[in-house]
A protein has these predicted regions:
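Hydrophobic helix-and-loop "lid/oligomerization" segment in the mid-to-C-terminal part
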Residues: 1-60, 80, 98-100, 108, ...
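Active-site cavity-forming subdomains of large catalytic enzyme subunits
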Residues: 54-126, 130, 134-143, 153, ...
Length: 326
């Protein structure tokens, strides 16, 4: 049986994909994965991915940290004979009726795992995407009679997503983070240890700050400026030298991302202040050459500086507008 795990392009999508890949492989499944190219494929599952999976005789698609809004895409997958399992934590899409009531829409997958479903009795609703994937893995391991301790080991990765997804650190999120930090400080993962070395954390205690401001951004930089597959390969790498090469590459990418963000923000501030835009109710700034993957970061920094809603546009976005894309 061929299974493809399909990830949301982010650090939490990378983590979800990694732990699902490890777990499914442990259950003797034939697993491959797909993390989209941010520029070419955008976010989430799309028609081309589904058709390619069908052409490759894939049996099951499992989404990681996405899929709850992919109504049409999952319908297509079912029409093509694929089974679909959705693991997601995002809000359930809905249609608001004239009377103000809401009709919630769930994709017609074979299994849709999301604690925010209105018909879900799971008591904790604020899991991150990797947390939802972990809960799926726990149940999977029970079905395959795999020791619970093996699932618990995966919390060292879930902890990264808990911090970087900025979910509330309460209830299960806090429990997962606490246990994950214990595990990650004694990790045997060659890729993580290489990243600790590359970022100057080797021999130091890994804490919430380390995850949120050093490890997380380094993993995420590959998705922002290159391809998130690099981060996933790092976590899967078993050769120390190759892992260190990948870790160094990710660390350098993150430094590049920081510098590009700094330059973009400085340019945006110059535009705003030279045009007296700080009196506007909404700040809309066009930065022609800024990398589209950091436009959102710059917009956030502008919002923080001026305490106003901010939108940053760049060349690719304007090209889409000119082509009729809203």
């Amino acid at each position: 049986m061929e299974i493809v795990s399909k990830s949301y392009l982010s650090i939490y999508g990378v983590i979800s994909t990694y732990i699902l890949n490890e777990a499914l492989t442990r259950c003797n499944a034939n697993v491959s994965f797909h993390i989209p190219d941010r520029i070419k494929e955008g976010y989430g599952i799309n028609e081309s991915i589904i058709r390619k999976a069908a052409e490759d005789n894939v049996d099951i698609i499992i989404t990681c940290d996405n899929g709850i809004s992919a109504i049409d895409q999952i319908r297509l997958a079912k029409e093509l004979g694929l089974k679909v399992i959705v693991t997601d934590h995002h809000d359930i899409p809905f249609i608001e009726k004239e009377d103000g009531s809401r009709e919630y829409i769930i994709p017609k997958g074979d299994c849709v795992v999301n604690p925010k479903r209105k018909d879900c009795n799971y008591p904790f609703k604020s899991l991150c995407g990797a947390g939802v994937a972990f809960k799926f893995i726990e149940e999977l391991y029970r079905e395959f009679n795999i020791p619970e301790s093996e699932a618990i080991e995966l919390l060292q990765y879930v902890a990264i997503a808990v911090v970087c997804d900025v979910v509330d650190l309460v209830d299960e999120n806090r429990i997962m983070l606490k246990k994950g930090l214990e595990l990650i400080n004694n990790t045997n993962n060659i890729g993580l240890r290489a990243l600790f070395k590359a970022t100057g954390l080797e021999g130091k205690t890994i804490n919430v700050y380390s995850l949120g401001f050093v490890i997380g951004p380094s993993i995420n930089a590959s998705g922002r400026l290159e391809q998130a597959i690099w981060a996933l390969k790092l976590l899967m790498e078993e050769n120390k030298e190759l892992a260190e090469e990948l870790a160094d590459k990710l660390h350098e990418l993150n430094k590049d991302r920081q510098e590009l963000t700094k330059e973009g923000l400085e340019k945006a501030i110059e535009i705003i202040e030279s045009n007296n835009m700080d009196k506007d109710k909404v700040l809309v700034v066009y930065l022609e050459d800024v990398h589209e993957s950091i436009a959102g970061i710059i917009a956030g920094r502008i919002r923080e500086r001026y305490n106003l809603p901010a939108i940053v546009l760049q060349r690719h976005m304007m090209e889409l507008r000119d082509q009729g894309v809203p």
